[in-house]
């Protein structure tokens, strides 16, 4: 029997797509930038106006030759179907002449169209023409996800602030015309699940007050370049349900944590610059001592090291700590046995050193309690430039000979010249394996088309 011709047996990509129902096509088109959605109008008569019914707008000002073209397109899209809900709206906004009343009016129209997902990324560099948000955004009853960059919030009337469905909020370089607006905004979100705040120079953020019983994830990062002129805002956190908190490159006078879940994972990179610095450090360490998983930066540990030395204070017990990721600098590396001594139930340990001293300067006589009872996994990372073979051996010996329940010691490539010697060290734990990670290979994808995009979205849509 003759084989069917390729032309008859194999549907083209456009034929296969066109066989889908309109509702499914609209959901697929809502996942791509509007510019690409418009291009589908050329495929066939059926597709000519399909993009006009997509419940999403994804715009980039730089893709339009003239600013007036973008404005005309925006207005015509909304006017074509006055009842169309705009569930997702994204605008990369970069114009030379910003007209605030017209911009606010357009965003206001979108907010009132049943909006669920809003992203505004402003790249306007005109100080006098701040990109402001409409007051209606404060009371958008349908909004679920909010992402804003370099925009301004005007002070609202308190009774207008209500975002009952908002679950994720990402604010970067956002200015507030009032020091209490951010706190009011956060507390108005009854179901807020994830909050990200990234501060920039001159954003006039005021204090960061995060009070939310529903919040599970909180990320705070500083992009400020000159701490001498403008420190990061003070922070106050009261989030009993918080499961993850990340503080990156932060420096403030005060960081108060009233309440945090004992199951929380915390990533800390913060230092303090306050008159009563010792009290601030003590309260902060005590507040995070209840968490289950902790990642702590070298400069934060250096601050703690200086505090302990100057005040002859003891680091509080981290009795609940199960997993620790810690980075040590040259000036504070020797405190790591002492710090581990405060973690009696530690199970997994990841240590990173920016250097190692000479063997004669190493004193690892203190054996923490967790070495005897709970520590099962250790990973050591030393820069490849560190050449002190004897120092690396001392570090490895410290764990191999003292950890009675250790199951695995992972060493990075810097230990390549001593790995065989380390494996011959008599082990306190007979079942301990000593290994080095294999190099990672990047996955490279080739080519792209609309078909794999659609195939990826269909299962997700059908599951909804």
Curated annotation (Swiss-Prot):
Domain annotation FBD: ranges: 359-413
SMART domains registered for this protein in UniProt: FBD
Coiled coil ranges: none
Superkingdom assignment: Eukaryota
Start-end of each LRR repeat: 96-122, 123-150, 152-178, 197-222, 223-249, 273-298
Domain F-box: 15-62
CDD domains tied to this protein: F-box_AtFBL13-like
UniProt key word Repeat: yes
Protein name, per record: F-box/FBD/LRR-repeat protein At1g80470
Gene3D superfamilies named in the record: 1.20.1280.50, Ribonuclease Inhibitor (3.80.10.10)
Matches recorded under PANTHER family: F-BOX/RNI SUPERFAMILY PROTEIN-RELATED, PROTEIN WITH RNI-LIKE_FBD-LIKE DOMAIN
UniProt cross-references to Pfam families, sorted A to Z: F-box, FBD, LRR_At5g56370
The species this protein was found in: Arabidopsis thaliana
Keyword annotations: Leucine-rich repeat, Repeat
């Amino acid at each position: 029997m003759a084989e069917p011709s390729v032309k008859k047996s194999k549907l083209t990509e456009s034929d296969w797509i066109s066989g889908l129902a309109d509702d499914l096509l609209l959901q697929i088109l809502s996942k791509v930038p509007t510019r690409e959605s418009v291009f589908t109008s050329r495929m066939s008569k059926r597709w000519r106006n399909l993009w006009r019914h997509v419940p999403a707008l994804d715009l980039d000002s730089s893709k339009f030759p003239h600013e007036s073209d973008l404005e005309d397109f925006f207005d015509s899209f909304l006017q074509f179907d006055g009842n169309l809900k705009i569930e997702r709206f994204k605008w990369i906004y970069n114009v030379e002449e910003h007209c605030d009343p017209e911009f606010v009016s357009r965003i206001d129209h979108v907010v009132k169209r049943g909006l669920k997902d809003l992203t505004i990324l402003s790249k306007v560099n005109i100080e006098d023409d701040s990109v402001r948000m409409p007051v209606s955004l404060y009371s958008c009853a349908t909004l679920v996800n909010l992402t804003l960059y370099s925009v301004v919030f005007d002070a609202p009337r308190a009774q207008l602030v209500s975002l009952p469905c908002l679950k994720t909020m990402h604010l970067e370089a956002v200015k507030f015309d009032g020091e209490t607006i951010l706190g009011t905004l956060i507390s108005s979100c009854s179901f807020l699940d994830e909050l990200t705040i990234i501060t920039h120079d001159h954003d006039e953020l005021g204090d960061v007050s995060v009070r939310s019983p529903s919040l599970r994830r909180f990320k705070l990062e500083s992009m400020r370049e000159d701490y001498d002129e403008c420190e990061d805002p003070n922070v106050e956190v009261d989030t009993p349900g918080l499961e993850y908190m990340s503080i990156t490159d932060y420096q403030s006078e005060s960081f108060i944590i009233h309440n945090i879940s004992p199951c929380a994972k915390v990533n800390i990179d913060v230092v303090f610059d306050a008159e009563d610095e010792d009290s601030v450090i003590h309260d902060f360490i005590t507040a995070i001592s209840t968490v289950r998983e902790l990642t702590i930066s070298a400069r934060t540990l250096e601050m703690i090291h200086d505090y302990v030395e100057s005040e002859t204070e003891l680091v509080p017990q981290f009795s609940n700590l199960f997993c620790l990721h810690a980075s040590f600098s040259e000036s504070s590396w020797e405190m790591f046995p002492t710090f581990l001594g405060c973690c009696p139930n530690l199970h997994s340990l990841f240590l990173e050193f920016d250097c190692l001293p000479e063997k004669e300067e190493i004193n690892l006589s203190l054996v923490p309690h967790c070495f005897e009872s709970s520590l099962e996994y250790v990973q050591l990372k030393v820069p490849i430039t560190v050449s002190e073979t004897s120092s690396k051996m001392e570090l490895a010996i410290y764990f191999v000979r003292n950890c009675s329940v250790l199951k695995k010691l992972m060493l990075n490539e810097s230990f390549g010249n001593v790995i065989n010697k380390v494996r011959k060290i008599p082990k306190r734990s007979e079942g301990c394996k000593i290994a080095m990670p294999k190099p990672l290979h990047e996955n490279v994808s080739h080519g792209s088309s609309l078909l794999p995009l659609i195939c990826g979205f269909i299962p997700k849509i059908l599951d909804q």
